[in-house]
């Protein structure tokens, strides 16, 4: 964004927040317009070649996808890197306690703020991220100190949505795999690891 100048008679108030779903759609469209093949398939099995190499992904519709390099983007399940190639997971839970999140979007606010707010809660912290069509809310917490039900109730009370909307509980594996690259597979994102942002 523009760099604020010292002589502004006001404090600049802007920020950039991206709706992850819309960003994904934009990147898909941008890539397919440039020749990338995009297919919505669910991989159900992984075919190994040598011990540390992947030969193909087998999909539920019978499609077999061969490749030279595979990127494991299967989230916490880490289907290729951990489940198939046996990459070692190094947990950090002994020192980093937050292992759950409850998320609940709320209506777009007319009092737009340019920043994400991070607010302390009883067993963790919560965020409030203003987007153009909604506000993203979530509460990251430790399941050792609060139940999922109590965490949801605490978030609902904090954002004033006691009876509205459907909350989702996310379980997080905090830690990382020992090697991000194994054979011809690169683990990316949550397949490789996760550390809760404020910890």
What are these regions (language model features)?
Residues 1:
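Dinucleotide-binding Rossmann-like beta1-alpha1 core, especially the glycine-rich loop
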Residues 5-160:
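Predominantly flavin-linked oxidoreductase catalytic cores and closely associated redox partners
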Residues 132, 141-199:
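FAD/FMN-dependent oxidoreductases across multiple families
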């Amino acid at each position: 964004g523009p760099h604020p100048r010292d002589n502004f008679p006001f404090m600049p108030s802007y920020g950039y927040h991206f709706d992850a779903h819309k960003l994904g759609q934009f990147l898909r469209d941008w890539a397919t317009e440039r020749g990338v093949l995009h297919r919505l398939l669910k991989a159900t099995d992984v075919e190994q070649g040598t011990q540390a190499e992947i030969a193909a992904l087998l999909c539920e519709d019978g499609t077999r996808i061969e490749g030279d390099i595979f990127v494991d983007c299967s989230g916490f399940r880490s289907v290729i890197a951990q489940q198939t190639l046996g990459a070692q997971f190094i947990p950090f839970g002994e020192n980093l306690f937050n292992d759950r999140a409850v998320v609940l979007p709320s209506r777009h606010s007319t009092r737009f703020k340019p920043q994400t707010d991070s607010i302390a809660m009883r067993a963790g912290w919560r965020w409030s991220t203003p987007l153009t069509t909604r506000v993203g809310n979530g509460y990251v917490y430790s399941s050792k100190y609060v139940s999922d039900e109590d965490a949801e109730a605490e978030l609902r009370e904090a954002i004033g949505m006691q009876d509205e909307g459907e909350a989702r509980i996310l379980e997080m594996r905090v830690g990382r795999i020992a090697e991000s690259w194994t054979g011809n597979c690169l683990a990316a994102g949550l397949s490789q690891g996760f550390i809760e942002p404020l910890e």
